[in-house]
Amino acid sequence: CLSKKFEVAEFAGLRSSGCVTFSNKESSFFDVVSAQLTPKTTRSTPVKGETVAKLKVAINGFGRIGRNFLRCWHGRKDSPLDVVVVNDSGGVKNASHLLKYDSMLGTFKADVKIVDNETISVDGKHIKVVSSRDPLKLPWAELGIDIVIEGTGVFVDGPGAGKHIQAGAKKVIITAPAKGADIPTYVVGVNEQDYSHEVADIISNASCTTNCLAPFVKVMDEELGIVKGTMTTTHSYTGDQRLLDASHRDLRRARAAALNIVPTSTGAAKAVSLVLPQLKGKLNGIALRVPTPNVSVVDLVVNVAKKGITAEDVNAAFRKAADGPLKGVLAVCDEPLVSVDFRCSDVSSTIDSSLTMVMGDDMVKVVAWYDNEWGYSQRVVDLAHLVANNWPGSCSTRKWRSHWMSFARQILLMRNAKSMNNRFCYVSSFEMDDFRSQ
């Protein structure tokens, strides 16, 4: 049932890489004109419809998310990103081997080679490998890095992630919940429309669990009105746990990950309010780490304002969203599947429709699966594409927007005055509100 949902989507992953530009379904006149006329930042021959050169990307931390990100990016068509360097403490030997051979993803169907002691290649594309635990010592300025994918899980606050900016990078995307109210959080499918290039140089993609939870919570709140609720994520173990009993600041995580169900904390439910502010104080939750290496499942129970609903009503709302505004982010599964069936699922969350329940007239239980590595990494790529598509060209975005809005107004005024005199192509079906809304 999953394959039916992985079609061409606004936020598309490896199975649907034909549309990854976050283009609106209804293009305004400005969108059409500027796409053709905004100058490129390179010296190459201009190509119709191409707006800017590819942005140079560095991956800091070549672990689970870093390598998943590179695989996801490699599978995208016409990506506006160019991964040019990874920072990995293991050097080229570890970077190339672990990228090529993965216990969860299998062998990478790309030609991965070691070029020299500081370079690997992926299908002939050279990627530099550096090794430094101090972001201030990384060669971001020298390499002209535009975006750093911060995947270590260490530099998640302003001062830490800000070291990449000091080293010469222009933007940082943290692949974890950010610490500090000064770093905005974006969840693709929920609040990515709030992003603009000028807002912040450091942004967060939230956690994998928040990316699973927020899309369907948004649907429930819009359709049913969430009063309050609790969440439990049954989560695969991660590298933050111990393989065998050993010291850890969290005494439960100190216990052997492959032998135990480990209750622990998660900020995922509370973090939903960062992208859906109206839900602040309404959700909370815990995590149960279990002896599986990948794929997790969220169990949400909420009280809702709307009365007299059925499980079918709830699932119908999810199906509508999955086929509409959340296509490529949310899916609905009607088959009796288990966790392994959701490995390499591109979407952020898949509703298990048979497990949806309604108790009384206002309590709803929803279960949703997610690949906490692959699905999350697809959203990191999507967010990086969003950043790239909002990147200013050789002239500032604001200057070009003002220029072309002025140009469009002149056309409309001349059309309305019937004084075109064949100097411009006739423009129809556009009103001034179309431009004011841009």
From Swiss-Prot:
<keyword id="KW-0560">Oxidoreductase</keyword>
<keyword id="KW-0934">Plastid</keyword>
<protein>
    <recommendedName>
        <fullName>Glyceraldehyde-3-phosphate dehydrogenase B, chloroplastic</fullName>
        <ecNumber>1.2.1.13</ecNumber>
    </recommendedName>
</protein>
<dbReference type="InterPro" id="IPR020828">
    <property type="entry name" value="GlycerAld_3-P_DH_NAD(P)-bd"/>
</dbReference>
<feature type="transit peptide" description="Chloroplast">
    <location>
        <begin position="1"/>
        <end position="53"/>
    </location>
</feature>
<dbReference type="Pfam" id="PF00044">
    <property type="entry name" value="Gp_dh_N"/>
</dbReference>
<comment type="subunit">
    <text>Tetramer of either four A chains (GAPDH 2) or two A and two B chains (GAPDH 1).</text>
</comment>
<feature type="binding site">
    <location>
        <begin position="266"/>
        <end position="267"/>
    </location>
    <ligand>
        <name>D-glyceraldehyde 3-phosphate</name>
    </ligand>
</feature>
<dbReference type="GO" id="GO:0050661">
    <property type="term" value="F:NADP binding"/>
</dbReference>
<comment type="pathway">
    <text>Carbohydrate biosynthesis; Calvin cycle.</text>
</comment>
<dbReference type="InterPro" id="IPR020829">
    <property type="entry name" value="GlycerAld_3-P_DH_cat"/>
</dbReference>
<dbReference type="GO" id="GO:0019253">
    <property type="term" value="P:reductive pentose-phosphate cycle"/>
</dbReference>
<feature type="active site" description="Nucleophile">
    <location>
        <position position="208"/>
    </location>
</feature>
<dbReference type="GO" id="GO:0051287">
    <property type="term" value="F:NAD binding"/>
</dbReference>
<feature type="binding site">
    <location>
        <position position="372"/>
    </location>
    <ligand>
        <name>NADP(+)</name>
    </ligand>
</feature>
<dbReference type="InterPro" id="IPR020830">
    <property type="entry name" value="GlycerAld_3-P_DH_AS"/>
</dbReference>
<dbReference type="InterPro" id="IPR020831">
    <property type="entry name" value="GlycerAld/Erythrose_P_DH"/>
</dbReference>
<feature type="binding site">
    <location>
        <begin position="207"/>
        <end position="209"/>
    </location>
    <ligand>
        <name>D-glyceraldehyde 3-phosphate</name>
    </ligand>
</feature>
<dbReference type="Pfam" id="PF02800">
    <property type="entry name" value="Gp_dh_C"/>
</dbReference>
<dbReference type="InterPro" id="IPR036291">
    <property type="entry name" value="NAD(P)-bd_dom_sf"/>
</dbReference>
<dbReference type="GO" id="GO:0004365">
    <property type="term" value="F:glyceraldehyde-3-phosphate dehydrogenase (NAD+) (phosphorylating) activity"/>
</dbReference>
<keyword id="KW-0150">Chloroplast</keyword>
<keyword id="KW-0809">Transit peptide</keyword>
<keyword id="KW-0521">NADP</keyword>
<dbReference type="GO" id="GO:0047100">
    <property type="term" value="F:glyceraldehyde-3-phosphate dehydrogenase (NADP+) (phosphorylating) activity"/>
</dbReference>
<feature type="binding site">
    <location>
        <position position="289"/>
    </location>
    <ligand>
        <name>D-glyceraldehyde 3-phosphate</name>
    </ligand>
</feature>
<feature type="binding site">
    <location>
        <position position="253"/>
    </location>
    <ligand>
        <name>D-glyceraldehyde 3-phosphate</name>
    </ligand>
</feature>
<comment type="similarity">
    <text>Belongs to the glyceraldehyde-3-phosphate dehydrogenase family.</text>
</comment>
<keyword id="KW-0113">Calvin cycle</keyword>
<feature type="binding site">
    <location>
        <begin position="64"/>
        <end position="65"/>
    </location>
    <ligand>
        <name>NADP(+)</name>
    </ligand>
</feature>
<feature type="binding site">
    <location>
        <position position="88"/>
    </location>
    <ligand>
        <name>NADP(+)</name>
    </ligand>
</feature>
<feature type="binding site">
    <location>
        <position position="133"/>
    </location>
    <ligand>
        <name>NADP(+)</name>
    </ligand>
</feature>
<feature type="site" description="Activates thiol group during catalysis">
    <location>
        <position position="235"/>
    </location>
</feature>
<dbReference type="GO" id="GO:0009507">
    <property type="term" value="C:chloroplast"/>
</dbReference>
<dbReference type="GO" id="GO:0006006">
    <property type="term" value="P:glucose metabolic process"/>
</dbReference>
<feature type="binding site">
    <location>
        <position position="238"/>
    </location>
    <ligand>
        <name>D-glyceraldehyde 3-phosphate</name>
    </ligand>
</feature>
<dbReference type="InterPro" id="IPR006424">
    <property type="entry name" value="Glyceraldehyde-3-P_DH_1"/>
</dbReference>
